[in-house]
């Protein structure tokens, strides 16, 4: 029985954790053993779970990162115990997801991975692997990662460092360790990310592209929405413009406020994922909803919206676009990262970052010339079903193992 071990900051929690869970289910259905090693935050899983480190370890890692810019360089004991566990379960494939997040020591881990001889897969969900500090550089319009990170302009962003800038050292450490594993295969979850990886120090590693997908049995066109209007005080007689983010940092909150001042009274903007502070800042005509894990409510919100707006300034491949389309709602997005890759001209509009006038024109276009709901949904069913994507990973595992023997 082959064994798959995945490593991620979460287990069956959040988008990346659910991707690992879905891949694990496919492995199990094919007679494999599936294990997920995680740092923190989990939901019950069909895979076996192994927790890396402790809350105290995470706190120490976080504090030293804030002061010394040591992100990924602490958690030595936790990482060595993980390696002992890996030796015990002896996996055939090791699949990395997000290894940042104050829970792993990447030099210790990659020094071990370089010696195992096992096939290693690493899905890049952001840009952290090839920068000296940040997970995203689009907003800062920084391209130092192409040559050598130093004098970081984003030291105050995740993983925040308030005292030292060690971006040059971090860049060189990552380059050394991440390029030292002979059997490492990279996966980029967007074509945009794949193109940037090809310009980084990771360019010589095997690199594939697998888009993220969604569960189209969970996100569909929902007609049973009457109770939703009452629950969130959404007016029945308004056109709905929807925006969703789990974290609104650089996701266009201010742009939505500006848009509200330009929109006619026939529209109501609904924003999901807001903090208490943001809720207090909302003008008339904007309904705010806190972050919710209620998938049924999210499905209904997508379904009642006339248009889904993704005014993100920094993104890789947002699955909210997929969720909206699966629920029959056209998407308008800024041209940020891979955000446009799930759209076609028939079901979405791509506009320049910050172009609120173009956003306004696109909203009016879709409001008065609705896109057929089934056209939006069928595009996602055909191209971005999560089951399809998980099977692509499993096919890759089998290919790597066949060449490894």
Name the predicted role of every residue range:
Residues 280, 335-350:
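Short acidic/histidine- and often glycine-rich active-site loop of Leloir-type glycosyltransferases
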Residues 273-296:
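Nucleotide-activated donor-binding/catalytic signature segment of Leloir-type glycosyltransferases, i.e.
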Residues 370-395:
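A short, well-ordered alpha-helix in the C-terminal region of glycosyltransferases
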């Amino acid at each position: 029985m082959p064994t798959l071990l995945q490593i991620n900051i979460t287990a069956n929690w959040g988008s990346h954790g659910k991707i690992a869970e879905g891949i694990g289910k496919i492995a199990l259905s094919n007679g494999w053993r599936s294990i997920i090693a995680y740092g923190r935050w989990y939901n019950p899983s069909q895979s076996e779970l192994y927790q890396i480190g402790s809350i105290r370890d995470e706190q120490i890692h976080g504090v030293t990162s804030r002061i010394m810019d040591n992100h990924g360089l602490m958690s030595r004991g936790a990482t060595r115990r993980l390696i002992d566990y890996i030796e015990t379960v002896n996996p055939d494939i090791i699949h990395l997801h997000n290894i940042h997040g104050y829970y792993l020591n990447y030099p210790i881990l990659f020094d071990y991975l370089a010696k195992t001889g096992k096939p290693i897969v690493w899905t890049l969900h952001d840009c952290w692997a090839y920068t000296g500090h940040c997970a995203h550089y689009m907003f800062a319009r920084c391209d130092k990662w192409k040559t050598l990170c130093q004098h970081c302009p984003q030291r105050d962003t995740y993983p925040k460092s308030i005292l030292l800038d060690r971006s040059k050292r971090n860049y060189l450490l990552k380059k050394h360790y991440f390029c030292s594993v002979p059997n490492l295969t990279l996966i980029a979850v967007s074509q945009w990310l794949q193109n940037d990886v090809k310009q980084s120090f990771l360019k010589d590693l095997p690199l594939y592209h697998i888009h993220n997908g969604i569960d189209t049995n969970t996100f569909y066109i929902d007609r049973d929405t009457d109770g939703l209007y009452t629950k969130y005080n959404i007016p029945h007689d308004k056109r709905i413009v929807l925006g969703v983010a789990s974290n609104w940092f650089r996701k266009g909150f201010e742009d939505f406020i500006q848009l509200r001042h330009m929109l006619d009274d026939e529209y109501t903007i609904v924003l999901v994922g807001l903090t208490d502070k943001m809720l207090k800042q909302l003008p008339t005509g904007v309904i705010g909803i806190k972050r919710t894990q209620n998938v049924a409510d999210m499905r209904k919100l997508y379904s009642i919206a006339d248009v889904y707006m993704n005014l993100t300034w920094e993104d890789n491949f947002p699955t909210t676009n997929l969720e909206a389309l699966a629920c029959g709602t056209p998407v308008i997005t800024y041209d940020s990262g891979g955000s446009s890759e799930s759209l076609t001209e028939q079901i979405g509009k791509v506009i320049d970052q910050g172009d609120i006038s173009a956003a306004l024109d696109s909203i009016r276009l879709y409001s008065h010339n609705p896109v057929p709901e089934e056209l939006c949904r069928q595009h996602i069913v055909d191209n971005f079903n999560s089951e399809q994507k998980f099977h692509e990973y499993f096919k890759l595992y089998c290919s790597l193992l066949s060449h490894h023997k």
